[in-house]
């Protein structure tokens, strides 16, 4: 992007804060902030407001602001200039240095703007010098962003260790997921046969579809890998009379799934085991196998070994249904902010492309004969989850901490946008064991 002389900046920002006498005044901080924000967002197509750390309000663009971007710390503005990528914004939102009021989905589009923003070095240095005068001021987070003692990460910096990422995704109580997953507790893509269907209806449709694709018959043996909360295992046993062996490495999910099996009177059909897929015996004893969204959490390097274990567990000719999130860019790479978010939830996870998945399936001696793209269904699923999560904001923040709520909200919104844009996909593959 070419540099712009100072007098070429049309400054589409307007100052909205007035003094008590009604006269509009600007301090040195406001002048510098105005200049910096004007340069960073001069080409941004959506109108929005900015509330600075001292309460001053600026508006960007024409029309009614879609959201208000609240900078609680002057240092965030400095970092926005210096790093010129959305990762710092993501970190700042999670830590409470940034607040978003209004349309959160629209605010997330700022990530794309920063992905494409390229400032010449001399111009970036000029903006940084301006920003440094702001960052030297001591800023204190306002009371409404104060860290809550319920979350172990509230005293940590915005950059969270990967071990905490595991805790965010796996080591949280079941009632957290119950608040937003839906009554079926299906932590994966639902299937909306109609856009008017509820989340519960769409989840039931997905469970039925999976069982039908696997051609489940009374007396079949089904291996449910990463069985989660036991939803598919109980559904298949209850509605199709199959024997299900579900495995999960998550103690919380294991306890919940066991309880569901007992409460639904399915102990004669369903066995839930706390185990890793790597411990599966190579007995070739299962008629069918299903794996709902584990590959995207494994990491690409582990996928061949995982498929080899599934192959060894199935009978020759057995059916395998794999339900996988894929990266739709050629290199299977993520932008910086998405990578940061995913590290908070699934630090070991890594998406790969659909083409690479097919290659892995073939190398593992699976013949893929049915593929369905479920990207639009995941968009609708995420919207429903997000609505549920936001409706439970107060209770989640009280029990899990504001930071945990923000990371999950950010992750769901970012995921929905990526599915909408086709950056990521969801593929349901059905294959036979050679």
Describe the predicted segments one by one.
Residues 264-277:
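Conserved SAM-binding strand-loop segment of SAM-dependent methyltransferases
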Residues 304-316:
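A short glycine-rich, Lys/Arg-flanked "PGG" loop and its adjoining helix->strand segment in the class I
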Residues 229-240:
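Conserved SAM-binding loop of SAM-dependent methyltransferases across substrates and taxa
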Residues 278-289:
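A short acidic, Gly/Pro-enriched loop at the edge of an enzyme's catalytic core
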Residues 218-228:
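Conserved class I S-adenosyl-L-methionine
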Residues 317-325:
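Conserved beta-strand signature within the Rossmann-like core of class I S-adenosyl-L-methionine
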Residues 325-434:
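Substrate-binding/catalytic lobe of Class I Rossmann-like enzymes that use SAM or dcSAM, i.e.
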Residues 2-197, 202-203, 209:
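Feature captures hydrophobic
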């Amino acid at each position: 992007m070419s540099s712009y002389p100072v007098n070429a900046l049309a400054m589409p920002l307007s100052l909205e804060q007035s003094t008590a006498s009604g006269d509009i005044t600007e301090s040195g901080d406001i002048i510098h902030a105005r200049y910096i924000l004007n340069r960073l967002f001069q080409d941004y197509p959506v109108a929005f407001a900015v509330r600075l750390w001292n309460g001053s309000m600026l508006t960007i663009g024409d029309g009614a602001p879609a959201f208000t971007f609240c900078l609680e710390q002057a240092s965030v503005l400095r970092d926005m200039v210096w790093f010129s990528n959305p990762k710092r914004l993501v970190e700042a939102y999670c830590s409470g240095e940034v607040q978003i009021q209004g349309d959160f989905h629209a605010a997330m589009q700022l990530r794309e703007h920063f992905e494409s923003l390229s400032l010449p070095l001399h111009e970036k240095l000029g903006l940084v010098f301006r920003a440094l005068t702001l960052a030297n001021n001591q800023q204190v987070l306002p009371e409404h962003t104060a860290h809550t003692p319920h979350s172990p990460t509230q005293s940590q910096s915005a950059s969270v260790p990967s071990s905490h990422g595991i805790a965010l995704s796996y080591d949280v109580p079941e009632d957290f997921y119950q608040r937003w997953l839906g009554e079926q507790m299906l932590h994966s893509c639902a299937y909306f046969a109609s856009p008017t269907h509820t989340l519960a209806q769409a989840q039931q449709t997905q469970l039925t579809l999976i069982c039908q694709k696997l051609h489940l018959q009374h007396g079949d043996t089904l291996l449910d890998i990463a069985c989660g909360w036991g939803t598919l295992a109980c559904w298949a046993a209850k509605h199709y009379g199959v024997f299900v062996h579900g495995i999960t490495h998550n103690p919380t999910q294991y306890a919940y799934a066991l309880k569901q099996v007992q409460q639904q009177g399915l102990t004669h059909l369903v066995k839930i085991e706390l185990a890793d897929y790597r411990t599966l015996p190579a007995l070739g004893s299962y008629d069918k196998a299903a794996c709902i969204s584990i590959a995207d959490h494994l990491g690409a390097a582990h996928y061949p070994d995982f498929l080899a274990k599934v192959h060894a567990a199935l009978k020759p000719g057995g059916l395998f249904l794999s339900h996988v999130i894929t990266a739709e860019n050629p290199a299977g790479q993520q932008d910086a902010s998405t990578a940061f978010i995913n590290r908070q939830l699934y630090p070991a996870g890594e998406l790969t492309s659909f083409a690479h998945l097919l290659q892995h399936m073939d190398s593992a001696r699976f013949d893929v004969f049915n593929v369905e793209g479920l990207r639009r269904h995941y968009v609708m699923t995420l919207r429903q989850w997000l609505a549920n999560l936001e409706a439970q904001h107060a209770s989640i923040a009280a029990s899990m901490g504001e930071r945990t709520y923000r990371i999950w909200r950010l992750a769901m919104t970012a995921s929905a946008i990526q599915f909408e844009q086709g950056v990521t996909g969801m593929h349901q593959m059905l294959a036979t064991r050679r």
